[in-house]
Amino acid sequence: MSASPVKAVAIEYGIDVSYDLGWISANESRGLLGIVVAYGRIIPESMLNKTPMINVHFSLLPRWRGAAPVERAILAGDTHTGVCIMEVEPTLDTGDVYARREMELTDAHTSDSLTKDLARLGGDLLVDVLRNGLQVPTPQDGATTYAHKLSSEEGRIDWNSLSVEVSRHVRALRAFTVVDGQRVRVLEVEVLTPSSATVPGEIAPDASVDTADGAVRLVMVHPEGKGPMTGAAWLRGKGFDAPLICE
């Protein structure tokens, strides 16, 4: 197993690397500053008393504190998001903010592509903050929302939702549906023109699926036990002798 880029650089400069938080906490050496990026655990106050820490958080705090800010922003239909460099506290994402940078969140973003964009944005901002030195941070201001941890069952598509909500669901999560008892991952959909006559979950021969206000086309799917394929190819393989329903 190859070392991560961070570990490779640390080894090059003779810096100890550990994945054990207990070892780090017990170590008596004091660093000048700790940097945390997308770290999903609370850091003990005993560690923070030894070494001040800052965190690169993938949202515009206090919106989307918590474990899944990228996915929650897409699901909510946010049109803008960004990154914050914040002071780490023993409580969850409550620290004062040293710097923030905003970006547009488009209908083309998936959780993967948005994470990559935010990582680049956050990396650039972190370099700027470190280069200029930590200034006086600003307390978080505004309405607080929480990006609760995702569950696997949350990926199941509710076809009684609006088409745009189904699209967000697919772009944000490991979305899936069940057809004829088979679990099918939905990788990409296209929102179609709204229609007044729909049966949510019913699949048409053109690989479109009815929603509460219209339909989405299954562009790419990943059926259980097979590889990724187009929605049209998947339907051809199943045949179309009877109406198919996504559950």
Pin down the residues of each PLM region.
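C-terminal substrate-binding/catalytic lobe of Rossmann-fold NAD(P)-dependent oxidoreductases
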Residues: 168-213
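Short, surface-exposed linear segments at secondary-structure transitions and domain or protein termini
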Residues: 192-202, 225-232, 236
